[in-house]
Amino acid sequence: DANGSEQGKVRPVVVIQNNRGNKYSPTTIVACLSSKVYSKHHLPTHYLLPEGLGLKYKSMVMCEQIRVLDKSRLIKKITKLDKRHMMHIDRRIKISLDLKQQHLHSRK
């Protein structure tokens, strides 16, 4: 169930979890998409995907709307985004989560 500004209903998502996690975990991490690109406030956490990527409409990746989903909830693969799009999305995820280089540390 969605409350307030949370995204509800069946919608496309971008899988943002790394490939190793996707291979071994029963869950995956996703960012929600919205086709209401003109009604959305353009936040620094938003990335506009152009038409022609297998989506019906231009869509906004909302990197502040990150979810963990059981893989069984994924209906079908629509497309694979190239590295350029994923770099833009990665940058916005870092903004959303306030991940700065000085905050990242290795664990033993």
Task: Please report, for each region that a protein language model flagged, where it lies by residue.
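C-terminal terminal-subdomain/extension
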Residues: G52-K108
